[in-house]
Amino acid sequence: MQLSLTQARTWKGLLLLVSCMILWISVTPTPYDQMSNEELYDNLLSCSHRTHVVARKMYKILDLNVAERRCFKNKRNNTCHTTSTHTAKTNEDLLKVIISVSNAWIYPLKMLIPAVLTHLGSYDGMMARAIELNYGNQKILEGAKFLLSRIQPGIEENDYPVWSSLKELRSSNKSIHLFAFCKFFYCLRKDTKKIKDYLQILRPNIIKNKW
């Protein structure tokens, strides 16, 4: 039986997802409780840098190859769901913002994978990058939580903002879902940069063992 283009794309995406999951399971990371603060920080910074690079690449691919520069033209109209996140004033605040922003992307990044499979799966590497972003954001969230628990044990988790227009990613209307993807990757690129920058600000205190 010959598969349709949509079915073939779906199977390709599922096989890629399974392959990535097997790869992650086969790699046994060092538990956070066995890392020094500096080692944990280096792990977080490396992960945040990679995540930002991938988010920036996906935005560029979408804008140039799919949306015909509509992402760039409409970027000033984008309001991100994390805009209301509080400004950080202390080292602890920096970590709390990182945790809040990462938390705010957990569900959207899970929803991104099937949306990319449906609408952008034919573009080389987009599916793999969507999976990598989902995994990278989870690792940043886990690591930041663990680091904060060392300096403020028993701290309660703050509320995080929710994206209300995720359903537009699944729209069958091309204009609607392309605009939603543009906004999604614009905001993700912006937030992954914020996380990376905040982690870099923390570096002096980590290196000087102030924690």
Swiss-Prot record:
<dbReference type="GO" id="GO:0046427">
    <property type="term" value="P:positive regulation of receptor signaling pathway via JAK-STAT"/>
</dbReference>
<dbReference type="GO" id="GO:0007166">
    <property type="term" value="P:cell surface receptor signaling pathway"/>
</dbReference>
<dbReference type="GO" id="GO:0005615">
    <property type="term" value="C:extracellular space"/>
</dbReference>
<feature type="glycosylation site" description="N-linked (GlcNAc...) asparagine">
    <location>
        <position position="173"/>
    </location>
</feature>
<dbReference type="Pfam" id="PF00103">
    <property type="entry name" value="Hormone_1"/>
</dbReference>
<keyword id="KW-0732">Signal</keyword>
<dbReference type="GO" id="GO:0031667">
    <property type="term" value="P:response to nutrient levels"/>
</dbReference>
<keyword id="KW-0325">Glycoprotein</keyword>
<feature type="signal peptide">
    <location>
        <begin position="1"/>
        <end position="29"/>
    </location>
</feature>
<feature type="glycosylation site" description="N-linked (GlcNAc...) asparagine">
    <location>
        <position position="77"/>
    </location>
</feature>
<dbReference type="GO" id="GO:1903489">
    <property type="term" value="P:positive regulation of lactation"/>
</dbReference>
<feature type="disulfide bond">
    <location>
        <begin position="80"/>
        <end position="187"/>
    </location>
</feature>
<keyword id="KW-0964">Secreted</keyword>
<dbReference type="GO" id="GO:0030879">
    <property type="term" value="P:mammary gland development"/>
</dbReference>
<dbReference type="GO" id="GO:0005148">
    <property type="term" value="F:prolactin receptor binding"/>
</dbReference>
<keyword id="KW-1015">Disulfide bond</keyword>
<dbReference type="InterPro" id="IPR001400">
    <property type="entry name" value="Somatotropin/Prolactin"/>
</dbReference>
<dbReference type="GO" id="GO:0007565">
    <property type="term" value="P:female pregnancy"/>
</dbReference>
<keyword id="KW-0372">Hormone</keyword>
<comment type="similarity">
    <text>Belongs to the somatotropin/prolactin family.</text>
</comment>
<protein>
    <recommendedName>
        <fullName>Prolactin-3C1</fullName>
    </recommendedName>
</protein>
<dbReference type="InterPro" id="IPR009079">
    <property type="entry name" value="4_helix_cytokine-like_core"/>
</dbReference>
<dbReference type="GO" id="GO:0005179">
    <property type="term" value="F:hormone activity"/>
</dbReference>
